Amino acid sequence: MTALILKRVAQAIPVMLIVAILTFLLMKLLPGDPAILIAGDGASPETVERIRVELGLDQPTVVQLGQWLWNLFHFDLGRSFLLSQPVSQAIAERLPVTISLALLAFAITIPVGIIMGVVAAYLRDSWFDMGVMSLALLGVSVPSFWLAILAVILFSVTLGWFPSAGYVPFLDSPLGWLRSLILPASILALFQIGYLARMTRSEMLEVMDQDYIRTARSKGVSEYSVLSTHAFRNALVSVLTVSGYIFSLLIGGSVVIEQIFALPGLGRLLVQAILARDLPVVQGTMLFLGFLFVAINVLVDILYTIADPRVHYD
């Protein structure tokens, strides 16, 4: 197992390097000059040029990329143009909000999605089964921002059940933390519940058609034991892999949700940095999210192998 972990980590290193290089090059394609942004609209050309020299923007792209990778190797993501603080500090301050939102949405998605998928498989071709498939289609076709706006209008503005914006830290008030996140987390989870339910249903149907399931039923094993002990346990391996992918999607989907609900997380930080052309923050945030996705995939691969020792990665 140790060899597997070391192998997966070693395979992830070049992927992370590619993510870092692509992040830097994509930022070069953004319009606007950071030096002009820092200097202000009324700054003289001499002032703008001086700032460009100080930031190293006058250097060739290859030199800037080398400096960026060197700083990254020393865990230096640079300094924000507008926040006047290190990018790593800005990310660290907002990371708990994004992780809290994603974890709460994940805690909603996994049990609800799995239960719906299992029941839909058991009640194949029933109204409940068709409802689950409709929910999965809804998650693919309906934009998250549109549903989030409707939820704010209904549950916050009209009914007043939940706050429409803002975030309460967990240590300040656990109940306030839950009230500030339950609505955005539910909207974020809704789009993944249908996907997980459909995947669970598909895996359950495939397992339930196997010979050993029919053998268990012929021996008089209760239907509950057939579903929970035999069918679900074997279908769980594939569901585990999808769960890691879903958590990555929840973190990525938080960008839109945080913006609508004014949550001070990484997604909102990224959007504000893009609008303000704060390139160090954009680079650092995108790079951190990319590394986080890679780390999640590595962890899922390891858990997948633990859950099913028959699986081997070349």
UniProtKB/Swiss-Prot annotation:
A GO cellular component entry from the record: plasma membrane
Record Pfam families: BPD_transp_1, BPD_transp_1_N
Transmembrane segments: 12-32, 101-121, 135-155, 177-197, 237-257, 286-306
Compartments it resides in: Cell inner membrane
InterPro entries: BPD_transp_1_N, MetI-like, MetI-like_sf
Keyword match Transmembrane helix: yes
GO molecular function: dipeptide transmembrane transporter activity
Membrane-protein topology: Multi-pass membrane protein
Domain ABC transmembrane type-1: 95-304
Gene3D superfamilies: MetI-like
Record keywords, A-Z: Cell inner membrane, Cell membrane, Membrane, Transmembrane, Transmembrane helix, Transport
PROSITE patterns recorded: ABC_TM1 (PS50928)
Main location: membrane
Assembly behavior: The complex is composed of two ATP-binding proteins (BRA1094), two transmembrane proteins (BRA1092 and BRA1093) and a solute-binding protein (BRA1090).
Function: Probably part of an ABC transporter complex that could be involved in peptide import. Probably responsible for the translocation of the substrate across the membrane.
Family the entry assigns: Belongs to the binding-protein-dependent transport system permease family.
Protein name (database record): Putative peptide transport system permease protein BRA1092/BS1330_II1084
